[in-house]
Amino acid sequence: MNKGIERGLKELDIPYDTFFYQFNDWEKDDDFLEQFHAYLKAGNYTDVLSVNFSPLISILCEELGILYTAWVYDSPIHIRNTDSLKNSCNRIFFFDRGQAEGYCKNGVNAIHLPLAVDTDVFRINASKREKESYRTDVSLVGKLYQTEYTYFTAPLQGYTKGYLEGIVNAQGKIYGGYLIPELITDELLARMNKEYAGVATDGFKMGRRELEFMLACETTGRERYMALALLSGHYQVDLYSTDEDKRLKNVRYRGYADYYTQMPLIFSQSRINLNISLKTILTGIPLRVIDVLGCRGFVLSNYQEELMEYFNAGEELVVYENIEDLFYKAKYYLEHEDERKQVALAGFERVKRDFTFRERLQTMYGEHK
């Protein structure tokens, strides 16, 4: 997103400087606090903009009386202490409306803003041979979400273990709804921690947020595994990930993919690009979907409420309702090349027109500043 944001700021003639820092810990880094404090004081800045929310930036901006604008594309926000979300200097734009509404109810200045794509950034002049090396029927770029679910459930008694398995199975059958938080009760956590106390010597306790995230990742991981296993039995399937699952013997593992130099070729040369969202995304359109469309790629995605609001499903991208539906829709579009290309082109035209960084930045700095 960084290149797109910078190009958008230039288009709008908004002057800016960039500050790069590699965090060791997003929530505790004295070197960063010292360096960025001096940088802000020397530059006489009125606003700080970051991709995703940084507690340390918020703390500094609160102290110096500077507006802090964050654009979040992650769900959930990966911070342990959420107190800084309520700082008065913050304007936090969330790609996920459901997430924004939840934070708003808890006193956070949370605003819904879908993500964007700069189609020119992804334009690559690749040779025919280079393009051919990325050609495949189906591809997935992302994690397999191999969790420690088995490790953490192993010490639990049969009833508790079965209840957790029931949560994962129930969530796996629901598309367009997020059940996990409602099913994690105080009674469940108390029972789990009582059972852990009987075997753990380090005083370990499972927290609500940790359990919710683990179950969401486990559910997502199972869905991704099933999709890849099913499709790879019939078509060439490529996986771009640092993860590997030896059970997926028919999947071609391609390793890590660079965001700017490889992903545009992956998305444009894959006949079908899968989007299987992490279950913690309540309503929002993941960055992966918008990036694929911005590279003229064809998207086959799970249901997300905002996908249906911002796109014409079946015309600009395709949405599946369950794993069986995913297989049959993949089969259909792999057998109907002209329709597949037509959908991909329409999706590209949609994001090029309606998902620009210029428009999103105008929302940030026009209506809200």
Outline where the language-model segments fall.
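Short acidic active-site motifs
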Residues: 35, 57, 80-81, 261-262, ...
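N-terminal pre-catalytic "stem/leader" segment of glycosyltransferase-like enzymes
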Residues: 1-65, 209-213, 237, 357-369
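Membrane-proximal helix-turn-helix segments that form the acceptor-binding/catalytic region
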Residues: 76-90
